[in-house]
Amino acid sequence: MSADSKVWAHASADTWTTAQGISTYDLDTSSIKREKIDCHEQFNDGYGPPPGTASTDAVSYAADPTAYFNLYTNMGAAPTTTPMMHHEMGEAMKRDKEAIYAHPLYPLLVVLFEKCELATSTPRETSRDGTTSSDVCSSASFKDDLNEFVKHTQENADKQYYQPNPQLDQIMLQSIQMLRFHLLELEKVHELCDNFCNRYVTCLKGKMPLDIVGDERASSSQPPMSPGSMGHHGHSGSPSMGGAGAATPMHYPPPYEPQSVPLPENVLGGGHPLEMFPGSSMAYAMAGMAAAAASSSSSQPQPGDHPLANGGTLHSTAGASQTLLPIAVSSPSTCSSGGLRQDSTPLSGETPMANGNSMDSISEAERIRRRFYMCVIVSAGPSSSSLHQHHLHHPHHFPHHQLQPPAHHQDFLLPPPPQNIIEQSLHCAGVSMLDASLIPPSSSSSASEYHGDMMSHMYSHHDVYHHQDMTYTDYGDYGTPDVVMMSSSDVKMEDAASVSSSKSGGKKQQPGTPNGRVGKSRGRDEFSVCGSNEDGRDSVLSDSANGSQNGKRKVPKVFSKEAITKFRAWLFQNLAHPYPSEEQKKQLAKETGLTILQVNNWFINARRRIVQPMIDQNNRAGRTPHMNVCKNRRRNRSEQSPGPSPDSESDSGANYSPDPTSLAAATAMHYPGAELYMQRTMNYGGFQPFPNPAMQFMNPMMGFPVAPAVDAISQQWIDLSAPHE
C-alpha cells in the first residue's frame, strides 16, 4: 500500500483533524491543500469511489462524508442581514405598534377580545328560573359597551388628535368585525347548550326512577302536585315529546309525589283488589263509587271522599276506612320499542325488600311473577278496566245516581273479596276467564245492560272510545296470555255484540263501541309479541282470493286481539313442539287475516320471549325440564303435524314427555297460584291437572270435573267473540 493511500485506511476522527486528511481548511492562510490519492485498493468492495484517479477539484465528492460536512461547516454561514438592517426593521415594527395602540378604535378592540376570552373560559351555571349567571357574551352587553365607548370618544374628542390612515383604519374595522362575529357564535353555542341541558334534565326527571330525583324533590321550593291538579292529561309531558303538557325548555317540571311499590308477598291483609292501585285513575273512580254509596244524602261529592284528601284511605260502604296500599302503575303508552319507558318505577325505601335497588336489578323470574300479580289484579271486577281507561283520559266525576249500580246487580257486580293474595290472583283470573255459558242468563243479560248503560253515559259526555286493551301495558314481553287481560265485562259485551250481529243480518259491530265504531287504540302494538312495527307489517299487500279492487287487499299492520288469542292458544297447546308447520301457518294466516310472514315472525318472537323464559325459570328453580325447544335453529320444512323436536331424545332423555297435558301442567307451575290450584284439584279424585294449558289461569271452580266448563275451554281456538248457545 502506497503512502498516498494510507489516508483512506479508516482514518479516525483524530486523523481528520491533522494534516493527513484529504483536505483541510486553513482559516489563517485561506488556502486549500489538495492531495492526489488512489482509492482503488481500499474500496474494492463496491462501496467506495469508482476505480481511477480521484478528482482534485475543491468541490468534488469527499471520501469521508464527515470531513466533507466539516469542510463547509467550519466556513460558517454568511449573515443575510447586517446589524443596520435589523435596526431599521425594529424601528418600523415599533412605529406600527405605536400606531395601533394610539388608534381610537383600539380600546373597543381590547374590550371585544377580553369578552371573547371570558365567554370561552367562564363556566355558565343555570338557575332554576332558566337564567344564566354569566351574560358576558350577550348581545345586550356588547351594545352597552359600544354605547359607553361612543360616549367616551365624544367626550374626549377635543383632547385627541388623529391623523387618518386608511390602511390602518381598515385593519382595525376588520378586526373588530371578526371578534364581533366570534362573540355572536359563542352566544349561540351557549344558548344551544343551555337549551339541550335543560331539555335533557327535564326528560330525565320525567323518565328516570323516582329515587334518582328524590333530593331534587326534597330541596325544591315548589308545592307538590297532586293528581287532581294535573288537569286532563294526568302526567306532565316531556319537552322532547312535544305534548300539550310539555314544559318549556328553560323551566323545570314540578316534582313528583313519592310512591312505594309493595310486593305481593308483603301484602298481609286481603282487601278488595282495587285497593292495590290507589295511584291509578281506576282506584279514584271506584273510590268515588264507594263514597257515593256511603254518602247518598248529599248531592255533590265531598272533598273528604277523595282518596288523597283522607291521607290515603278509602271509605267503604260500611263506613270504615280501608288503608290504600300505594303502588306505581305502568303507563298505558309503554311499549317494548315505542320510545322511552314511562314506568321504570323502582322500589322505594318504604318497601321492606327494597334496599334501594331498582326494578332492573330484579331477576327475570321475579319480574315475571310480580307483573303477573299486577296483571290478574288489574283485570278484576266488571267494567273496571273501561272505567279506568275512561277516567285516565277524562278524570271527571259521574253523578251519584249514575255511578251507583242497581240493587239487583250488586251481588253479581261486587263479589266477596278473597282471603289472601293467591286466592285474589286465582279469583281475578277466574272472573276474567268465565265463559258466558257458565253465567246465569239473568245475570249475564242484566250485567250487560248495566254495563251498556254505563258505556252509553260515558259516550254522552265524551265521544271517545278507549278500548280495554289499553291496560295491556308491560306484560306482553313476558308471556302472560292476553286471555287473562280480558275482564268478564268484555266477554259479555262481545257475546252480546255477536248475538246482535247475527240478528241484524251478519253485520257485526265492534264490542264495547257505540254504533260499531272502532277506537284509535284498537289493535295496538302491545298485543303483539313482536313489540314493534316491522317493515313487513307496515303496508303489506297480498293477493286477494275474491278478486277485489285492483286484485289486492290490505293486510293489517298490527295484530288484532283475536289473532293474538289464537296464536297463544296454539302455542300453549303445543308447548312440546312450538313450531307450526307450513299448513298450520297458512291456516292461522287465513283465519287471522295476516300474512304467513307475520305469523312466522310472531312465533319466532314467542319462542324467544314466552317459551324460553319459562324454560330458564324452571332451570333456575332446579326443576326437571319437561320441554325441549331448540334455540336459534332453523326448523326443517315439513307438512306433518307438530311432534317432538328432532333432538328431543338426545337432550332430554327419559325426562322428556311429549304429552302436552302433563307438559303444560309442569310448565305452568311457576305461575302464582298454581300450587294452590293443584292442591284443590287433587282433592276431587283422579281428575287430571290442567286438561287444557289455558286452565292454569282459571278460577279453581273451573277445575272441577264439570262437563260444560271443560268442553267450553278445551276447544282448539279460544274465540271469545263467537256467540255461545
Swiss-Prot record:
DNA-binding region(s), chain positions: 552-614
Domain of life: Eukaryota
Pfam families hit by this protein: Homeobox_KN (PF05920), Meis_PKNOX_N (PF16493)
Domain MEIS N-terminal residues, every copy: 133-218
GO terms (BP aspect): animal organ morphogenesis; brain development; embryonic pattern specification; eye development; positive regulation of cell population proliferation; positive regulation of transcription by RNA polymerase II
Residue spans of biased composition, Polar residues class: 541-550
DNA-binding listed as a keyword: yes
InterPro entries to which the protein is assigned, alphabetical: HD, Homeodomain-like_sf, KN_HD, PKNOX/Meis_N, TALE_homeobox
Region span, Disordered: 214-258, 295-317, 329-359, 386-419, 491-555, 615-661
Regions crossing the membrane: none
Protein role: Acts redundantly with ceh-20 and ceh-40 to perform overlapping roles during embryogenesis. Required for postembryonic development of the ectoderm, including the Q, V and P cell lineages, playing a crucial role in ensuring that these cells and their descendants undergo their invariant patterns of cell division, migration, fusion and morphogenesis. Has a role in the mig-13 pathway to promote anterior migration of neuroblasts in the Q lineage. Required for multiple roles in regulating vulva development.
GO molecular function, one term: DNA-binding transcription activator activity, RNA polymerase II-specific
Protein name, UniProt field: Homeobox protein unc-62
Comp. bias regions, Low complexity: 219-239, 498-508
GO terms for cellular component: nucleus
Alphabetical UniProt keywords: Developmental protein, DNA-binding, Homeobox, Nucleus
Places the protein is found: Nucleus
Protein family according to the UniProt entry: Belongs to the TALE/MEIS homeobox family.
Listed Basic residues bias regions: 388-400
